[in-house]
């Protein structure tokens, strides 16, 4: 697109000059796009920081994971407080539960379970990893069932029972044993690495 603007020459006479505004417009659009992208990245990083903050602030890695376990129990409580008419709420809570569990699984599978293996607990780490596979299976089945169905809430309760056994085994036996085997320095390094992994998927 071109525009004509009136200008005066050195003798004060009006002259017409043509200016192409396409380049100018493209510059404005590119600048706006870059600004929008930068704001989007800041918002994403801010959201990730908010999601990971409760874990990062909880203390050592085992305390942080116990905090996440408690958050999962609270989501189960909220789900079980719904009825068959609360389908939208159930879907939202299930999505929240899935995200929390997937982030938690990444932290454990990428950081804590390898540390368990290094500490001589390969069989226990393999069993915990296998149980995470069942978690994913439960989530898949729940996402593909009508949330108004009585079978859906029954599946939630079955899922909760199994996942609480898994969490209890970690909190009561395996995690305290691992923490006791590691030096303070190694525990701090494990905590830092775990929080980095959690931040990636928060």
Q: Residue ranges of each PLM-predicted region?
A:
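Small-residue-biased structural context
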Residues: 2-202
């Amino acid at each position: 697109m071109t525009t004509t603007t009136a200008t005066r020459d050195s003798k004060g006479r009006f002259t017409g000059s043509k200016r192409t505004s396409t380049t100018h417009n493209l510059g404005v659009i590119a600048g706006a796009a870059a600004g929008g992208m930068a704001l989007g990245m800041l918002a994403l990083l801010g959201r990730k920081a908010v999601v990971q903050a409760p874990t990062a602030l909880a203390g050592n890695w085992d305390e942080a994971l116990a905090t996440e376990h408690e958050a999962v129990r609270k989501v189960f409580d909220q789900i079980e407080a719904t009825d068959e008419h609360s389908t939208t709420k159930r879907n939202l809570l299930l999505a929240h539960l899935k995200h929390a569990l997937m982030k938690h699984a990444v932290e454990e599978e990428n950081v804590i379970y390898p540390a368990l293996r290094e500490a001589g607990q390969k069989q226990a780490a393999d069993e915990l990893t296998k149980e995470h596979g069942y978690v994913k299976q439960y989530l898949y089945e729940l996402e593909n069932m009508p949330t108004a169905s009585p079978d859906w809430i029954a599946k939630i309760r079955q899922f909760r029972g199994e996942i609480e056994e898994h969490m209890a085994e970690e909190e009561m036996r395996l995690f305290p044993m691992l923490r006791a085997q590691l030096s303070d320095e190694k525990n701090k390094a494990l905590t830092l690495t775990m929080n980095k992994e959690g931040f990636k998927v928060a």
